[in-house]
Amino acid sequence: MQQIRIPLSKIVFVFLVVLGCQQEKKLPFLGPKEVGEQGDTLYHKIPDFKFLNQDSLWVSQKDMAGKIYVADFFFTTCPTICPKMKTQLLRIYDKFAEDDRVRILSHTIDPEYDGVRVLKDYAKKLNITSPRWNLVTGKKSDIYRLGKKSYMVTAQEDANEEGGFVHSGAFILVDQNRHVRGIYDGTKEEDVNHLIEDMTLLLKE
Amino acid sequence: MINKLAILGLMIIGISCESREEITRQQYVVEGMNLYQTNCANCHQVDGSGLKDLYPPLARTDLWQRVKMSELACIIKHGQKDSIQVNGKPYNAYMPANPKLQALDIAELMTYMREKWSPNKTIFSLDSARYALKNCP
């Protein structure tokens, strides 16, 4: 019987390749892609925005530059999924408490009621502070357009819905360059575990 | 002999009556758990710990001794607009009403919450729930 001998160096090589592949796991770029002038792929990007936060300060894309952030849509009097989402966001807030590269951006979809004062009170009760966690308000049409077109989530008024609004419980993960890299169900603990893993991965990019 | 049998008979009836109430209580606890998770846990959390200073806890609170059970039943059904004190702390986020919950649902919910968090782990009967809801402020 002939014995097949594989040199050790080959085994080590294959092992390294496999290991290398695993380390190269990258998050996808979500949203519509375009082809640039040079034939390169242009990934979907969050456009410029400007909203007021709970401390009456402007928050724009400039404040998010070089940071990764989780965006969501909510309203303070929401009786259904928002408390669940906030419970999960608090986990993220606590988990990355020491990391200045991480932000949370919660947009109210009921800006008529959720003015700066209401948001301030809400933030105080959740024991959260800006700029790590911004609760923002602004022009309703701006918020809805940004939600739908850029973050790819539903957010609109609906008198038939409990609380008067229909919105998804999505958390959107945005990278350092304004690209959407993941969308998660913010009402499910397991999905948010996944998000936390992906955030750690994204911070290494 | 007859006496002994009679006593035994009474004892059996006694035990079975008691366990029938206990069986009902346990059924209420199980149904109440489902109702709690659907209608209450979003804000008050599955473990009853509440959400920071926004929504009050139900577990480890003075609610169960301080507030009348009928009053709690009414809050569940009709919501709460005013501030409420829990463990000496005021909470003023409004609580939405639950018009869909019927007397039986509320009896089951209350029985479940008592089982979990009240020192008094007895059934909150359907009659008590009906009576409480009829006399809400």
Each PLM stretch: what is its role?
Chain B
Residues I2-L8:
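Sec-dependent signal peptide recognition
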Residues D53-A59, K81-K134:
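Axial heme c-ligation environment in periplasmic c-type cytochrome domains
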